[in-house]
C-alpha cells in the first residue's frame, strides 16, 4: 500500500504536517476549505515565477495567517515590502473580505534542488521547452544529488518526445522507502503542457529518517558547518500588530 497511497497523507502527524491548520464547525468547514483552495490557486497563478513550493494556512479567530515557502523570497517581498502589501490585498480580494486581517510570512527554501515541488516544476519547464525527457530527468537527478538527498524517484507519463502512444517512464536513484512511516518523503506532482498534450510528472524525494522529535538523520553530502554559515531568509509580517 505504501506505493499506492499518497506519501504525504500516509505520514500526517508522523513526519508531515497539515497544510491547513484550523478548526471549524460542520457548517463553516466547506466554505473555509474552498477559501483555502482559492487562496492557493491565486498565489500559484500570480506568483508562479517566485518558485513557491508550499503554502501553509492557519486561522486564529478573525485573523488569517499565510506562510509561503519560496526559492526566491525577493520576488514576493519586493522593494521595501511593497510585494507583501500587494499580496495581502490580493488575498483579501480573493476571500471577498477586505477587512480581514491577513498576516503573511515568507520563508526561503533552504535547499532548492532538494525540494520535490521545485524539482517537478523544473522538469515541467524543461519539457515544455521541448527538451528530451531522458536528458531532463538526468539533469534533475544530478541537481538533487548535488543537494544531498538520500534518494529520488521521478515518473513522467504521457506522449513522451511526441510519441503516438502514451507511456510511463520512471527512474530511481538511491533509497526511496515508501513503506517506512518514519521516512521523510517529500512528494509533489506537476502537469507539463506541451504541443503534443499534457505530461504528468511525479517526484519523490527521500530526505532521511525521523528517529524522534529531536533528531533527524542528515542527508549524505550535507555539510553542517556550511549550512550553519548561511541561514535561510525569513520575512515575518508584523504590520497588522498594534
Swiss-Prot record:
Keyword terms, alphabetized: Ribonucleoprotein, Ribosomal protein, RNA-binding, rRNA-binding
Q: Which PROSITE patterns match?
A: KH_TYPE_2, RIBOSOMAL_S3
Residue numbers spanned by region Disordered: 216-242
GO BP terms: translation
* Composition skew (Basic and acidic residues), residue ranges: 233-242
Q: Which residues form a coiled coil?
A: none
Q: Which GO terms describe its cellular component?
A: cytosolic small ribosomal subunit
Q: Which GO terms describe its molecular function?
A: mRNA binding; rRNA binding; structural constituent of ribosome
Q: Where is the KH type-2 domain?
A: 39-110
What family does the entry list? Belongs to the universal ribosomal protein uS3 family.
Stored NCBIfam families: rpsC_bact
Query: What role does this protein play?
Result: Binds the lower part of the 30S subunit head. Binds mRNA in the 70S ribosome, positioning it for translation.
Q: How does the annotation summarize its subunit structure?
A: Part of the 30S ribosomal subunit. Forms a tight complex with proteins S10 and S14.
> What is the official name of this protein in its record?
Small ribosomal subunit protein uS3
Species, as recorded = Synechococcus sp. (strain CC9902)
Protein encoded by which gene = rpsC
Amino acid at each position: 500500500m505504501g506505493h499506492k497511497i499518497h506519501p504525504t497523507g500516509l505520514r500526517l502527524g508522523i513526519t508531515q504536517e497539515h497544510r491547513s491548520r484550523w478548526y471549524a464547525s460542520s457548517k463553516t468547514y466547506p466554505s473555509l476549505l474552498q477559501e483555502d483552495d482559492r487562496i492557493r490557486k491565486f498565489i500559484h497563478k500570480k506568483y508562479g515565477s517566485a518558485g513557491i513550493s508550499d503554502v501553509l494556512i492557519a486561522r486564529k479567530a478573525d485573523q488569517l495567517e499565510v506562510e509561503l515557502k519560496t526559492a526566491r523570497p525577493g520576488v514576493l517581498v519586493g522593494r521595501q515590502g511593497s510585494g507583501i502589501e500587494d499580496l495581502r490585498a490580493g488575498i483579501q480580494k480573493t476571500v471577498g473580505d477586505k477587512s480581514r486581517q491577513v498576516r503573511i510570512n515568507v520563508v526561503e527554501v533552504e535547499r532548492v534542488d532538494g525540494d520535490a515541488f521545485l524539482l517537478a516544476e523544473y522538469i515541467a519547464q524543461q519539457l515544455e521547452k521541448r527538451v528530451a525527457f531522458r536528458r531532463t530527468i538526468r539533469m534533475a537527478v544530478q541537481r538533487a544529488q548535488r543537494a544531498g538527498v538520500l534518494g529520488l524517484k521521478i515518473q513522467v507519463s504521457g506522449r513522451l518526445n511526441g510519441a503516438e502512444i502514451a507511456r510511463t517512464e520512471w527512474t530511481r536513484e538511491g533509497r526511496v522507502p515508501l513503506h517506512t512511516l518514519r521516512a521523510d518523503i517529500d512528494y509533489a506532482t506537476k502537469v507539463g503542457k506541451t504541443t503534443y498534450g499534457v505530461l504528468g510528472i511525479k517526484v519523490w524525494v527521500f530526505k532521511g529518517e525521523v528517529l524522534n522529535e529531536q533528531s533527524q538523520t542528515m542527508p549524505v553530502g550535507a555539510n553542517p558547518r556550511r549550512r550553519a554559515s548561511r541561514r535561510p531568509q525569513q520575512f515575518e509580517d508584523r504590520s497588522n500588530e498594534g
